[in-house]
Amino acid sequence: MAKTLYEKLFDAHVVYEAAGETPILYINRHLIHEVTSPQAFDGLRVAGRQVRQIGKTFGTMDHSISTQVRDVNKLEGQAKIQVLELAKNCEASGISLFDMQTKEQGIVHVMGPEQGLTLPGMTIVCGDSHTATHGAFGALAFGIGTSEVEHVLATQTLKQARAKSMKVEVRGKVNPGITAKDIVLAIIGKTTMAGGTGHVVEFYGEAIRDLSMEGRMTVCNMAIEFGAKAGLVAPDETTFAYLKDRPHAPKGKDWDDAVEYWKTLKSDDDAVFDSVVVLEAKDIAPQVTWGTNPGQVIGIDQVVPNPQEMADPVTKASAEKALAYIGLDANTDMKNIPVDQVFIGSCTNSRIEDLRAAAAVMKGRKKADNVKRVLVVPGSGLVKEQAEKEGLDKIFIEAGAEWRNPGCSMCLGMNDDRLGEWERCASTSNRNFEGRQGRNGRTHLVSPAMAAAAAMFGKFVDIRHVELN
């Protein structure tokens, strides 16, 4: 019987499935951070349980840490408590932790692939909704809640119902200036933020295959933003080249054997998907969100939609509410919207490829006077090291940006990088919900190049018309 890649991955990890019961899956890799793990470890202690397989769980510090200081003793309040608890729990359990004193530390979904902890064919979980990022490697990766974090620590398994399968095909090649972020925002714009609910999505098409691993991670990272459980890209030579010689990747004959197996990880030609979505790559323009969810997105060459022209009453009401919050009028040209802050970072767009794209725009230019602050936050210590080796940090600083240490930063209002009330931000992150970047902050999601251009010109501009250096 023909199977999709998702079905192959799921079936290969079923430990036990009783009639009428939810299957139990084996979990190959468990990634943890300081926010969703403390209660899980407390639960283990109360129950008198140990971590079952310490070699399959790895920790990092990312969400609540400061991107300005590397000393845990200089953290304040809840952030300090969370970081200290993670360090204590990992040490007591024997779990490997990439803390703030190591260059391997970084955002969990950047650190995992960099270290070769993310491999094709794996099941990967983390107490974080953007765990779908790791699906770019042909791994079944999804976010879990804190009680499930405890269960995986204790058993290395998880009850998991089968999802439906969705195929998203992006046909042909994108035009110059169009990035992975534009591709996935265009997908979400077409499907809406609920279009993938109940599905695991596999991304297909020439435009997807042309992407680097960094680009594929961006696409899979935002699968959750149109409701999908997980996102997948079948592994290929691009995948293998990225993983070869990573610290935790197989070596020698084990590598050769692994690659032979990984090559089988693809949907069968006659596999049937429950849902299919098709986009033409040539039609995708640089994307900018105009509302308060990632599905409220248009091309930079378009105007803000008019809710009065929307037939569906729910969509209309949502658009009216979004525009009231975001402070825009219908039919506003997206290129006439000024920004107060710019954030380049997050698990969506903080890898070296993203920083190079931003630097190409910012080189030889200066931050616009109306832009109060530009934060450039690398996704890991290794990304930071590579960027500095290439001189990208100097480009950012000379342009008027702040070059920070690794962390989740302004993606979410959980640390000391936040928007002021009603400030408008061009952000490379993944969510533009109300208050996501700070109380009453207004977020517009864009690619790294588009964010950099907004910083230099003080408003959204079409990156296709910006000379790169």
From Swiss-Prot:
The keyword Transferase does not apply. It is an enzyme of class 4 (lyase). One of its GO terms (biological process) is L-leucine biosynthetic process. Pathway: Amino-acid biosynthesis; L-leucine biosynthesis; L-leucine from 3-methyl-2-oxobutanoate: step 2/4. It catalyses: (2R,3S)-3-isopropylmalate = (2S)-2-isopropylmalate. It comes from the Bacteria. Keywords: 4Fe-4S, Amino-acid biosynthesis, Branched-chain amino acid biosynthesis, Iron, Iron-sulfur, Leucine biosynthesis, Lyase, Metal-binding. Its cofactor is [4Fe-4S] cluster. InterPro entries: 3-IsopropMal_deHydase_lsu, Acnase/IPM_dHydase_lsu_aba_1/3, Acoase/IPM_deHydtase_lsu_aba, Aconitase_4Fe-4S_BS, Aconitase_4Fe-4S_dom, IPM_dehydratase_rel_enz, IPMI_cat. [4Fe-4S] cluster binds at residues 347, 408, 411. Pfam families: Aconitase. Binds 1 [4Fe-4S] cluster per subunit. Its EC number is 4.2.1.33. GO terms for molecular function: 3-isopropylmalate dehydratase activity; 4 iron, 4 sulfur cluster binding; metal ion binding. HAMAP family: LeuC_type1. Belongs to the aconitase/IPM isomerase family. LeuC type 1 subfamily. Catalyzes the isomerization between 2-isopropylmalate and 3-isopropylmalate, via the formation of 2-isopropylmaleate. Heterodimer of LeuC and LeuD. This is 3-isopropylmalate dehydratase large subunit. It comes from Actinobacillus pleuropneumoniae serotype 3 (strain JL03). The gene is leuC.
